[in-house]
């Protein structure tokens, strides 16, 4: 799905494009299993500690999850929802480290299947489960969770007012939402917005002020918002270099055209961080009541 007229795309079409994007993402469950095997570790000997080197497909690895856990004050009593859980690295890490129950939700069936396979291999299937579903129509009962988390995923989702309203519904009163996301410092120009969607499937990138308004309207309040822009700029430069280092594997699995298209998109994305157009933050939010 390569849609240049992104301003005319409906929310459903945007979500379909995101789903397709992650079906062909260079990091997959098979790639992780292959990396573990290359270390000489048999599948039956996989543990959470083994996977941590490979399965944290977000900015900052386990250190970022530790920071999120510190903000949230995660305990074994928490019922955690990981929204846009991908291959499940943070969900497994939370359950392993805090002893809590975690439910991961992701739009893309192949990510849910991969997350489930990795979780079973790590022996954590009794603590972590994954479901396919739409974050704009959360398939959970009211007040089902004490904590919701997400990392650099809401940028993919259109209609963020509906997103945060749905999260507020499934949190119990006083429940926490702790998430990091890609932000714009000011409203993005049309060309940058189009290129970010076409290349990275980022949809309607928000400002910090946007989020504060939407969260307030949904009956939540921001406890803190930590600026991560400088740290992420450094990380993104490193991730782009890592992607290029996987050229041979990516071309073999997805083809040269796919590799080059994603490489160009990532170069544009990193450039917007280096120039200060894009930013990032970790939000700690509470549901009122």
Tell me what each language-model feature is.
Residues 161-176:
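A short glycine-rich, Lys/Arg-flanked "PGG" loop and its adjoining helix->strand segment in the class I
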Residues 182-202:
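Short, glycine-/aromatic-enriched active-site segment of Class I SAM-dependent methyltransferases
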Residues 204-219:
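Short alpha-helix
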Residues 226-289:
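Conserved Class I S-adenosyl-L-methionine
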Residues 41-45, 58-78:
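Conserved alpha-helix/loop element of class I SAM-dependent methyltransferases that forms part
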Residues 79-137:
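Class I SAM-dependent methyltransferase SAM/SAH-binding core
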Residues 2-38:
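N-terminal auxiliary segments of SAM/dcSAM-dependent transferases
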Residues 136-147:
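A short acidic, Gly/Pro-enriched loop at the edge of an enzyme's catalytic core
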């Amino acid at each position: 799905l390569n849609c240049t007229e992104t301003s005319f795309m409906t929310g459903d079409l945007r979500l379909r494009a995101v789903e397709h994007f992650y079906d062909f993402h260079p990091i997959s469950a098979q790639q992780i299993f292959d990396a573990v095997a290359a270390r000489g570790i048999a599948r039956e000997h996989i543990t959470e500690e083994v996977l941590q080197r490979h399965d944290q497909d977000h900015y900052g690895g386990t250190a970022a999850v530790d920071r999120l856990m510190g903000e949230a004050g995660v305990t074994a009593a928490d019922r955690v929802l990981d929204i846009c859980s991908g291959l499940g690295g943070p969900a497994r890490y939370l359950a392993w480290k805090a002893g809590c129950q975690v439910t991961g939700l992701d739009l893309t069936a192949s990510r849910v299947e991969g997350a489930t396979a990795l979780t079973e291999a790590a022996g954590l299937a009794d603590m972590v489960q994954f479901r396919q579903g739409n974050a704009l129509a959360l398939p959970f009962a009211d007040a089902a969770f004490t904590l919701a988390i997400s990392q650099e995923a809401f940028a993919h989702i259109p209609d963020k007012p509906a997103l945060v309203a749905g999260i507020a519904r499934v949190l119990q009163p006083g429940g926490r939402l702790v998430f990091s996301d890609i932000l714009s410092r000011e409203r993005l120009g049309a060309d940058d917005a189009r290129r970010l969607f076409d290349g990275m499937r980022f949809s309607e990138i928000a400002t910090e002020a946007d989020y504060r308004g939407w969260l307030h309207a949904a009956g939540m309040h921001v406890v803190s918002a930590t600026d991560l822009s400088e740290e992420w700029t450094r990380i993104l430069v490193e991730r782009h270099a890592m992607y290029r280092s996987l050229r041979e594997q990516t071309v073999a699995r997805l083809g040269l055209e796919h590799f080059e298209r994603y490489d160009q998109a990532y170069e544009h994305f990193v450039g917007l961080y280096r120039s200060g157009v894009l930013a990032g933050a970790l939000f700690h939010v509470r549901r009122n009541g």
